[in-house]
């Protein structure tokens, strides 16, 4: 694969270009071979870019789009009502081969609907799934689906497991252990769809299926790929992010309570900073839409500069690893 070219929906998210522009500049500084296309309102983008006079504009250019998809707009409105929206135009650049990937912090439902409409799914895939990395005791695991598919059949869960395993392999995990998230590890536990999915996965050739996993096992690193429907996955992800933020805040507050605590806190500061970095949601920001004929990464809408950089890094890595092509090559051997 040539140098990654990433199209960015510069108007999406809570902070829009005021986050996207500095994050893009920082990303280019650490990725000398990548190129970025900022899609959005040229006047605003050029004004923000003018604050970086030493920027190599051959590696970052602006592509005009006059409309923005709001966070409260329905996917159907995004599909029909705004042909020049920054999100849509960025995806069209990928569809037309002018960019290798799209990154957006905008409306998740609209991004999924437009991605399916413009990029299409890979052969054999019914629905794309959202996947991201979550921290564990042993490093991280890949969790999917994160909300794209609230109701899933057993076949959908099977497809998610296959896609998650192939993606984990592409990103460096050897023979990833695949598990279904469940209310227990015994075979009798779980609803009918989870049980049927487990039966399908047990028969799959070339897939390292390890059975069921509970929520605490996920964080102990008992699996490399954890599969669930989007309803459960989204709640789990948001709860995890909230817990990480609460723990960080509580630790910081405790080390402010009294002189002795402040002294201990000063000594422990390097360790605490490392711990905070290990579990910080910004480090793991960026959910990939697996199963499309193109690379799309969704950044958290509230992500600041560091988090958006993480989403850009994930997109660039998937471009370098030719993830859609690798998925296509493996899926035909693993899908039912």
From Swiss-Prot:
This is Phosphate acyltransferase. Coiled coil: none annotated. Belongs to the PlsX family. Pathway: Lipid metabolism; phospholipid metabolism. One of its GO terms (molecular function) is phosphate:acyl-[acyl carrier protein] acyltransferase activity. It catalyses: a fatty acyl-[ACP] + phosphate = an acyl phosphate + holo-[ACP]. It is found in: Cytoplasm. GO terms for cellular component: cytoplasm. Pfam families: FA_synthesis. The keyword Lipid metabolism applies. InterPro entries: FA_synthesis, Phospholipid_synth_PlsX-like. HAMAP family: PlsX. Catalyzes the reversible formation of acyl-phosphate (acyl-PO(4)) from acyl-[acyl-carrier-protein] (acyl-ACP). This enzyme utilizes acyl-ACP as fatty acyl donor, but not acyl-CoA. Homodimer. Probably interacts with PlsY. Its EC number is 2.3.1.274. It is an enzyme of class 2 (transferase). It comes from Pseudomonas aeruginosa (strain ATCC 15692 / DSM 22644 / CIP 104116 / JCM 14847 / LMG 12228 / 1C / PRS 101 / PAO1). The keyword Transferase applies. GO terms for biological process: fatty acid biosynthetic process; phospholipid biosynthetic process. Keywords: Cytoplasm, Lipid biosynthesis, Lipid metabolism, Phospholipid biosynthesis, Phospholipid metabolism, Transferase.
């Amino acid at each position: 694969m040539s140098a990654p070219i990433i199209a960015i929906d510069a108007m999406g998210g809570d902070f829009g270009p005021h986050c996207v522009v500095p994050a893009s500049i920082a990303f280019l500084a650490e990725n000398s071979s990548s190129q970025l296309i900022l899609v959005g309102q040229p006047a605003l983008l050029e004004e923000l870019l003018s604050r970086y006079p030493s920027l190599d504009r051959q590696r970052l250019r602006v592509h005009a789009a006059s409309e923005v998809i709001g966070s409260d707009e329905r996917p159907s409105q995004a599909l029909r009502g705004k042909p020049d929206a920054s999100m849509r135009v960025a995806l069209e650049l990928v569809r037309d081969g002018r960019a290798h990937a799209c990154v957006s912090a905008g409306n998740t439902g609209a991004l999924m609907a437009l991605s399916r409409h413009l990029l299409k799914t890979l052969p054999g895939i019914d629905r794309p799934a959202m996947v991201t990395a979550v921290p564990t005791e042993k490093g991280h695991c890949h969790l999917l689906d994160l909300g794209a598919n609230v109701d899933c059949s057993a076949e959908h869960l099977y497809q998610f497991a296959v896609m998650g395993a192939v993606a984990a392999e592409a990103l460096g995990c050897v023979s990833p252990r695949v598990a279904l998230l469940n209310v227990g590890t015994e075979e009798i536990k779980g609803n009918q769809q989870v049980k049927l999915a487990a039966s399908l996965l047990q028969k799959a050739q070339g897939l390292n299926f390890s059975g069921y996993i509970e929520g605490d096992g996920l964080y102990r690193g008992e699996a490399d790929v954890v599969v669930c429907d989007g309803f459960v996955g989204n709640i789990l992800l948001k709860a995890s992010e909230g817990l990480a933020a609460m723990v960080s805040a509580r630790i910081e507050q405790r080390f402010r309570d009294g002189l002795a605590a402040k002294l201990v806190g000063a000594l422990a500061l390097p360790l605490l900073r490392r711990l905070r970095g290990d579990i910080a949601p910004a480090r793991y920001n960026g959910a990939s839409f697996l199963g499309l004929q193109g690379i799309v990464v969704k950044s958290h809408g509230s992500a600041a500069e560091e988090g958006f950089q993480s989403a850009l890094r994930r997109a660039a890595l998937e471009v370098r690893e030719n993830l859609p092509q690798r998925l296509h090559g493996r899926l035909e051997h693993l899908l039912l």
